[in-house]
């Protein structure tokens, strides 16, 4: 009986997790985020500063760039611009959006 209960609980968690992942993909949110919160850019802000210092590395630079459809210069943001910050990230992406320099 206990094994059946444990298996049922694990299956429920797996189904809910799959539904959440599908919903986030539908919303286009990176890092398996479940929602976003707004952030108004202040003078001198960069995505690096926002991700690392303000949000204490709970979101990645590239997660911010992808969520806000920022192109190949992830630090090209403007004062008073409202960014969406993905929350509850399961993975953090600090590199996939950055240009790779070949020597």
From Swiss-Prot:
Indicate whether Signal appears among the record's keywords.
Answer: yes
- Give me the disulphide-bonded residues: 31-89, 62-97
- The segment(s) forming the LysM domain are 37-85
One GO CC term on file = extracellular region
Q: Which PROSITE patterns match?
A: LYSM
One Pfam family named in its UniProt record: LysM
Q: What is its main location?
A: secreted
Q: Does the keyword Signal apply?
A: yes
The recorded induction information for this protein reads: Expression is up-regulated during wheat colonization.
**SMART domains registered for this protein in UniProt:** LysM
Query: What start and end residues bound the annotated signal peptide?
Result: 1-18
For the null mutant, the annotation states: Produces no to only a few pycnidia.
- Name the UniProt key words of this record, in alphabetical order: Cell wall, Disulfide bond, Secreted, Signal
Which residues are recorded as binding chitin?
A: 44, 48, 75, 77
Q: Which compartments is it annotated to reside in?
A: Secreted; Secreted, Cell wall
The UniProt family comment states: Belongs to the secreted LysM effector family.
Function of this protein?
A: Secreted effector that enables the plant pathogenic fungus to manipulate host defenses for successful infection. Binds chitin and suppresses the chitin-induced reactive oxygen species (ROS) burst. Chitin-induced polymerization of homodimers forms a contiguous Mg1LysM highly oligomeric super-complexe that is anchored to the chitin in the fungal cell wall to prevent hydrolysis by host chitinases.
Q: Anything further noted?
A: In plants, chitin acts as a microbe-associated molecular pattern (MAMP) that is recognized by lysin motif (LysM)-containing plant cell surface-localized pattern recognition receptors (PRRs) that activate a plethora of downstream immune responses.
Q: How does it assemble?
A: Forms homodimers in a chitin-independent manner through interactions at the N-termini of Mgx1LysM monomers. Homodimers are further polymerized in a chitin-dependent manner.
Give the domain section of the comments: The LysM (lysin motif) domains are small globular domains involved in binding chitin in eukaryotes. Mgx1LysM contains one LysM domain.
Q: What is this protein called?
A: Secreted LysM effector Mgx1LysM
User: From which organism does this entry originate?
Assistant: Zymoseptoria tritici (strain CBS 115943 / IPO323) (Speckled leaf blotch fungus)
């Amino acid at each position: 009986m206990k094994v059946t209960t444990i298996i049922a609980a694990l299956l429920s968690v797996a189904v809910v997790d799959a539904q959440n992942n599908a919903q986030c993909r539908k919303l286009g949110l990176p890092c398996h985020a479940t929602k976003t919160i707004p952030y108004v850019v202040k003078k001198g802000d960069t995505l690096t500063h926002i991700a690392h210092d303000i949000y204490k590395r709970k979101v990645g630079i590239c997660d911010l760039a992808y969520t806000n459809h920022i192109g190949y210069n992830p630090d090209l943001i403007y004062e008073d611009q409202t960014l969406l910050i993905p929350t509850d990230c399961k993975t953090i992406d600090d590199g996939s959006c950055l240009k790779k320099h070949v020597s």
